[in-house]
Amino acid sequence: MMKQVKFQNAIRTATLSAGLFLSASAFAQQITVKGHVVDETGEPVIGASVKVVGGKTGAVTDIDGNFSIAADKKATLEITYIGYEPLKVVAGQDLKIQLKNTSTTLNDVVVIGYGRAKKNDLTGSVTAIKPDDMSKGITSSASDMLVGKIAGVDVQTGGGQPGSGAQIRIRGGASLNASNDPLYVIDGLAIDNNNLTGTSNVLAMINPSDIESFTVLKDASATAIYGSRASNGVIIITTKKGRAGQRPTVTYNGDVTLSTVQKKYKVMNAGEYKQALTSLGIDTSGLGTADTDWQDEIFRKALSTNHNISIQGGLKDMPYRVGLGFEDNNGIVKTSWMKRYNTSVNLAPSFLNKHLNINFTAKYMFEKDRYANYGDAIGNALTMDPTQPVRVNDEMYNCVGGYFQYLDNKGDKISDPNWTKMAKSQVPQNPVALLNNQKIIANTHDISSNLEVDYKIHGFEDLHLHAAIGAQYTDAKQHNDINKYSSSNNYFGWYGTDHQYKYSIEGKAFAEYAHKFGVHDIDIMAGAEQSHYHRTTYNFGSGIDEYLRDTNPELVDGEWNYVNNPQYKANTMWMSHNSLVSYFGRFNYNLMDRYLLTATFRADGSSRFRDGKKWGYFPAAAFAWKINNESFLKDVKWIDELKLRLGWGMTGQQNGIDDFYYTPKYTISDTYAQYPFGNTYYQTMRPTKYNPDLTWEKTTTYNGGLDFTALNGRFGFNIDGYYRKTTDLLATVSIAGGTNFGDNLLKNIGAVENYGVELAFNAKPIVTKDFVWDVTYNVGWNHNEITELETGSQDWVWTGSKVSRGNNTLVQVNKVGEPLNSFYVFQQVYDENGKPIEGLFVDRDGNGKIDNDDRYCYKNPAPDVIMGLTTKFIYKNWDFSAAFHASIGNYVYY
C-alpha cells in the first residue's frame, strides 16, 4: 500500500513538473514582434492590418507605419491593406516590410492606338478608366458607364426609348454636316458608326459587364495615329479576359429596376379647362363629360431586369472567357420595350515559350425592340381635351377603332360605303390610340470578330511583328404595322418593311521595335491598314384599300395588283461601299525617364475623293517632362508624379460624304416618274448632283496639360487646356439653278474653332484598415464658334431637323460668330412680371412688321460646362457609391 501510494505521488509529481516545464517553454517561445511597414516609395503605410496566421491576435500600424504584436517566434504574420498586395512574413525582430501597391495607376498599362503604354509615359491627353473604379450603378449600355466620369466628355442619353442610343461628344462638335461622333475601337477593331434602321446604339453590341477598361484619346497628338477617323476623338474599349493558370471562375450579376416618370407636366384638368374656356367666352357645349389625365393613360411604372453570367479561367497557356447577357427593358411609355441578348468569347493562347501570342475575340448581339411614338404620344397627351374619354361606345367611332378622335367627312378615295367618317388632321390626336394603333418591331443581329497575332522574334526579342484581321456584320429589319384605324393612315393603314445590312472588313499589319540604350529608351512602330465598308438598304411599304381588294381583286399571278392600289409605294433598293487605305508610324523617345517625345504620322487614301484629292496626311508630335524625376525633386518622396505635357497634331474627316459624290451617278425612277413611249411607260435614269472638288475636313489641335499625383495616390489632379480649329468644313448649301443636278450641294465652306479647359480631381480623404472614402470630380468648359462660312445670298445656312410642332420648319442655323447649330428664333416680349406675352415679338429691324428678318441667333444645344462627381465608400467587402453629373448652358427648343 505504501509503495503504491508513493508510486502514484511520484507520477503526479512528474506530471506536474512536465506541465510546468511545457508551460514555461511555451511562454519562453512568445516574443514581441516589432516592425515598420512602408510602400514602394518608402513612405509609411498607416493603418495596415497585421495578424498572426492561425491566431487571434492582431495589430494596426501607426502614423509612422510601426507596429508591435505578440507572436510565437516562428509564427507567420500577414500584413494587409486596401490597395496593396497581401504579404506574409516570418515573425522576427525589427522587421522591415514593403508592400506592393496595386491601386496606384502610374505604372498601369494603357491601351492606345496600335499598342500599349505606361500611364506615366503618356505624352498626349489620354484618360483611362475601369468600370470597377467608378460608381457601378445600373447600366444598359456602355455609354451609360461614361456619363460624368471623364472631363470634356459629354454624354447625352436618348429620349427614353428602351435601348436608345447616346450622343457622345469629346470637347464639343467640330463639324457642320459631317459626323461629330468619336471613333470606337473595341478589342482592336474599329467599329462602323453608321446606324441602321432599328438600331439606336452603336455600342449595344457590347455587354457592359464584359468591359475591362475605357481609354479616351482627346487631343490630336494621341488620336492622329487613326488619321481621318479621329477628328472627334477616340474611345478604345477593352473587354475582360481570363488569366493563364487561373482556375475556372463563374460569375453572375443581375439587377432589377423600376422606372417611373420623374415629374409630369402640369396641365389643366377637365374642370379647370371648362372654366378657362368659359372665362374666354368660348362655347363649351362641345366638351365631353370625362375627366381624363392623358399622361396617366400613356405612362406606366416599368419593371426591367438584367442578367449576366461569365466563366473565365486559363489552361496552361490559353486564357479564356465566355460571357452571356440578357436584358429585358420596358419603357415608361406604354407599348415600348427592348430585349437584348449578348454573348462574347475571348481566347488568348500563347506558343513558342510566349513568343507567339494570339488574341481572338468574337461577339454576337441580338436585339428586339418595339418602338413607341414617344414624341407624338407625349405631345398629344399635353394638348388633348381632358373632358374626352379614351374610348367611345358609338358606331360612329368604329372608323378609328372605338377611340375618341376628332372626326371629319370621309374623302373621295374611300371606297367602302360603311366607312362614314375619317380621323381629322391638324388637331390633337388621342395619344392612347397613337400607341395602340401602330406596331413597329425591329430585329437586329450584330456579329463581330477580330484575330490578332503577335510574334516576338526569337533571338531578337526587341522586335515584334503584329498582324490582325477583323470583321463586323449587322443585319437590321424593321416591320412597320400601322393599322387602318390610326389617325395618320386612316382607312388604308400602312404595312412595310425596312431591311438594311452592312459589313466591314479591316486588316492591318505593323512592326514594332523597342530597346533601351543606357539612358535612351526608344520605341518605333510602322504599319499599313486597309478597311472596306458596304451598306445595302431595301424598303417596301404600302397602304391597302381592303374593300377595293376584296370586291375587285384584279389578281395578277394570283396576287393583288398593288399598282391599282391608291396608296401604292414602290420597292426601293440602295447599296454603296467605300474603302480606306492607310500607312502609319509612331516614334517614342524617352531620355533618362524625364523627357519624353512622341511623333506620329498617318496617310489615308479614301475612295470618297477623286484622284488628286484622295490622300490626306496627318502628322502629330507631343513632348512631356517628368518634373518629379529631376534631381531637385528626387528627395520629395510625397510627390508621385508631376508631369508637363505639350502636344500638336492634325486629323481629318470624311464621314458625312456620300460614296462617289465626286462623280455623277444615275438613279432609277420610281413608278410616279415614268416616261411614255406610245402606250407604254418606262422608268428613267436620272443623274444625281456631284462635287469633284470635295476634300478632307482638317482639324488642327494644340494641347497643354499638367498631371500631379501625391501621397501614394491619395491625391491627384489633371488639368488640360486646348485649342482646336477645323477648316474645309463640309456642309450642304444652296446653289444656283442649272449649275448642277440639284438645288443644293455638299461643299467645303468654312471653319470652326473650339477651345476650353478641363480639370479632373481625385482624392482619398479617409483610408483606414477597413474603410476607404474615394472621391473623384471632373469639370470641362468649352467654347465653340464658327469663324468662316460660305453662305451665298444670306449670312447663315439652315441646319438640323424640322420642328414637328408649331411652325413645322427649321429652327437652327450656322452663322459666323455663333456656335454650331444655333437656334434661329424671334425675340420674345415679356410683361412687367417677367412672363412671356404670347404671340408678341420684337421688331428687330424696325420695319413695322414681324417677319423672318426679325429672327436672330439665340443659344444652342451644346453645353458650355459639363461636370461629374463620384463618391465611393468601401467598408471591408461592402461598398456604397453615388454619381452625379450636370451640363450647364445647353438649351432645347420645344
Segments predicted by a language model, with ranges:
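Low-complexity intrinsically disordered tracts that form flexible linkers/tails across taxa
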Residues: 369-390, 789-795
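Extracellular/periplasmic, surface-exposed regions of secreted and cell-surface proteins
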Residues: 134, 181, 274-275, 282, ...
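Short aromatic-centered micro-motifs
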Residues: 50, 79, 184, 390, ...
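Short, small/polar-rich motifs associated with maturation and membrane association
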Residues: 2-365, 373-374, 419-421, 448-449, ...
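Conserved C-terminal beta-signal and adjacent last beta-strands/turns
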Residues: 7, 14-15, 310, 774, ...
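Extracytoplasmic gating/loop element in the C-terminal half of outer-membrane beta-barrel translocons
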Residues: 284, 295, 428, 432, ...
